[in-house]
Curated annotation (Swiss-Prot):
Signal peptide (UniProt feature, chain positions): 1-20
Keyword Signal assigned: yes
Key words of the record: Signal
Domain of life: Eukaryota
Name of this protein: Protein RAFTIN 1C
Function per UniProt: Involved in pollen development.
C-alpha cells in the first residue's frame, strides 16, 4: 500500500510539472511548415492573422460591420443572405 501511495504521489508531481509547461499554445501547423521550408523569411502578418483564431466568445469587428451601432441603423438589405 505504501508503494502505491508513493507511486501515486510521484505521478501527481510529474503531472503538475507537465501541466505548467502545457499552458503555452503550440504554433499552428502552417506556421511550423512555413518556418521549416523558409527558415530565414518572416511569416507575413496577414498569414499570421489568418492562423490565429480568436478566443471563444470574442466577436471580431471588421470594417464592414464596425460602422453599424444600433439595430435601427442597419442598412435596409442584409447582403450576407445572398
Amino acid at each position: 500500500m505504501a508503494r502505491f501511495l508513493v507511486a501515486l504521489l510521484a505521478a501527481t508531481l510529474v503531472a503538475v510539472q507537465a501541466g505548467g509547461q502545457l499552458g503555452h499554445a503550440a504554433p499552428a501547423t502552417a506556421e511550423v511548415f512555413w518556418r521549416a521550408v523558409l527558415p530565414h523569411s518572416p511569416l507575413p502578418d496577414a498569414v499570421l492573422r489568418l492562423l490565429k483564431q480568436p478566443a471563444a466568445g470574442v466577436e471580431l469587428h471588421t470594417e464592414a460591420t464596425s460602422f453599424v451601432r444600433d439595430p435601427e441603423d442597419r442598412p435596409p438589405f442584409d447582403y450576407r443572405d445572398y
